[in-house]
Swiss-Prot record:
Family per similarity comment: Belongs to the RNA methyltransferase RlmH family.
Annotated binding of S-adenosyl-L-methionine, by residue: L76, G108, L127, S128, A129, M130, T131, F132
Annotated InterPro entries: Alpha/beta_knot_MTases, RlmH-like, tRNA_m1G_MTases_N
Protein name per the record: Putative ribosomal RNA large subunit methyltransferase H
Transferase keyword on record: yes
UniProt entry keywords in alphabetical sequence: Cytoplasm, Methyltransferase, rRNA processing, S-adenosyl-L-methionine, Transferase
Top class in the EC scheme: transferase
Organism, as annotated: Methanospirillum hungatei JF-1 (strain ATCC 27890 / DSM 864 / NBRC 100397 / JF-1)
Major localization listed first in the record, in broad terms: cytoplasm
Keyword Lipid biosynthesis: no
Length: 159
């Protein structure tokens, strides 16, 4: 059984989003072990580019600490490659077969990720060309993970 660890900046504040994420996590429990680790946003006292970059570096260090060399790291970033649900399913299927990978998804804060953090990914993906709040992006990730597992298993959820 594949293990998925989601490392994200910020907490889910809205209860309806937390409930939806919990529902998808529960649905996935027969396919994988999923865990989410949340890290606090770095303070950004002003909008000076160097202040924002320092916050991104600080957040990136937290997000990328403890990643094992065997982990398959998927970074979610607006600059990443867009893939279909079937494409994500193929990435997960390969990791299940080739193992002993743990899939690690990294979701940065509102200012994005540092260059160092981006370089630690095996692949950089974008959920959409549109911009979403990070809470919604996390919910979309859970839904797409569940959809990917149903595609892999040939279940009727994905049509």
């Amino acid at each position: 059984m594949v293990r998925i660890r989601i490392r994200a900046i910020g907490k889910i504040k809205e209860s309806f989003i937390r409930d939806a994420i919990a529902d998808y996590a529960k649905r996935m429990c027969s396919f994988c072990q999923v865990e989410c680790i949340e890290y606090p946003e770095a303070p950004v006292p002003d909008t000076h580019p160097s202040t924002i970059e320092m916050a991104c570096v600080s957040e990136g260090e937290k997000l990328c600490s403890g990643i094992d060399s065997l982990d398959y790291v998927i970074i979610l970033d607006r600059t990443g490659k867009q893939v279909s649900s079937e494409g994500l399913a193929e990435v997960i299927r390969r990791c299940e077969i080739e193992g002993p990978y743990q899939l690690v998804f990294i979701i940065g804060g509102p200012h994005g990720l540092s260059k160092d953090c981006l370089q630690k990914g095996n692949i950089i993906l974008s959920l959409s060309a549109m911009t979403f709040p990070h809470q919604i992006a996390r919910l979309l990730l859970y839904e797409q993970l569940y959809r990917a597992f149903t595609i892999i298993r040939g279940l009727p959820y994905h049509r």
